[in-house]
Amino acid sequence: MATFPVVDMDLINGEERAATLEKINDACENWGFFELVNHGISTELLDTVEKMNKDHYKKTMEQRFKEMVAAKGLEAVQSEIHYLDWESTFFLRHLPSSNISEIPDLEEDYRKTMKEFAVELEKLAEKLLDLLCENLGLEKGYLKKAFYGSKGPNFGTKVSNYPPCPKPDLIKGLRAHTDAGGIILLFQDDKVSGLQLLKDGEWMDVPPVHHSIVINLGDQIEVITNGKYKSIMHRVIAQSDGTRMSIASFYNPGDDAFISPAPALLEEKSEVSPTYPKFLFDDYMKLYSGLKFQAKEPRFEAMKARETTPVETARGLRAVRWNTTKRNQN
């Protein structure tokens, strides 16, 4: 079995820069995921983030999750559950404006630490985007500029905990999906596993490595690179023992950012059309919200339909929605 790619960022500025860039390129083309070590975020900050998040879950979120489980009767389920995920979660928005001060039940030290963490992650995300540009032969800053829109990128953090599950064979921690946005930076528990990606038709564990940051690519990177780089289906498997921490930060295009394949990556012949659609990111997100746990290809096709005529677009979206409703009823 292939070995999950691990990239040492210490090597990016030395004699092994070319080899490190090639490793990132291969991971983006063939995995859609890779793991970063020596990424520049201090271990002290990572340890503080982990402790504060685990303490917050125990103090505030754990009992609420147990009450939800009891209310829905999930401990006694006898057949597979397809409509929900075994996770306790909340979302912190950083850009274009922060909502951290508005989230209830967060201690002031927690808010301060997560703001500091977000600053470091934003810098790392933009550094990685420029490395992707270098590999793709795009001008430095191209991806950041493509994401910018009128108010800058959307950047936020999904804080999740996956408690022990009494029926891990029947309930997913998080159902299989690709991420809608740009580049995702995950700080995950190094003691409790559960994240898997779909590689060559088989589910493969993403190894939890202490103090690492897991990177994965979203649908917008696939579109901008015209399919050279891929977003990959992934899921979280519920575990019967231990609570898994997951802190995933999403560096996404701005709502009004216009997303399309980079002209430099299209074939030179003018008669060859792009494989991927052109759209406003917010329009894609509206479609994604109802189709997250389905294959990405129908989403791309629905967005491409909007490039033709309004009538064809309406028909295409109605067909997608009808099929979705039908599947949900089965």
Swiss-Prot record:
Q: Please name the GO terms of the biological process aspect recorded for this protein, alphabetically.
A: ethylene biosynthetic process; fruit ripening
EC no. given is 1.14.17.4
Q: Describe how expression is induced or repressed.
A: By ethylene and wounding.
Q: In its keyword annotation, does this UniProt entry include Oxidoreductase?
A: yes
Cofactor(s) recorded for this entry are: Fe cation
**UniProt entry tagged with the keyword Oxidoreductase:** yes
Task: Report the SUPFAM superfamilies cross-referenced here.
Answer: Clavaminate synthase-like
Q: What catalytic activity does the UniProt entry give for this protein?
A: 1-aminocyclopropane-1-carboxylate + L-ascorbate + O2 = ethene + L-dehydroascorbate + hydrogen cyanide + CO2 + 2 H2O
MF terms from GO for this chain are:
1-aminocyclopropane-1-carboxylate oxidase activity; L-ascorbic acid binding; metal ion binding
Q: Where does Fe cation bind?
A: H177, D179, H234
Quote the pathway field: Alkene biosynthesis; ethylene biosynthesis via S-adenosyl-L-methionine; ethylene from S-adenosyl-L-methionine: step 2/2
Fe2OG dioxygenase domain location: 153-253
Q: Which InterPro entries match?
A: DIOX_N, IPNS-like_FE2OG_OXY, IPNS-like_sf, Oxoglu/Fe-dep_dioxygenase_dom, Plant_2OG-oxidoreductases
Signal peptide range in chain numbering: none
Root EC class: oxidoreductase
Give UniProt keywords alphabetically: Ethylene biosynthesis, Fruit ripening, Iron, Metal-binding, Oxidoreductase, Vitamin C
In the record, the note on similarity to other proteins reads: Belongs to the iron/ascorbate-dependent oxidoreductase family.
Q: How does it assemble?
A: Monomer.
From the Swiss-Prot or TrEMBL record, give the protein name.
1-aminocyclopropane-1-carboxylate oxidase 2
Q: Which organism is it from?
A: Malus domestica (Apple)
Encoding gene (name) = ACO2
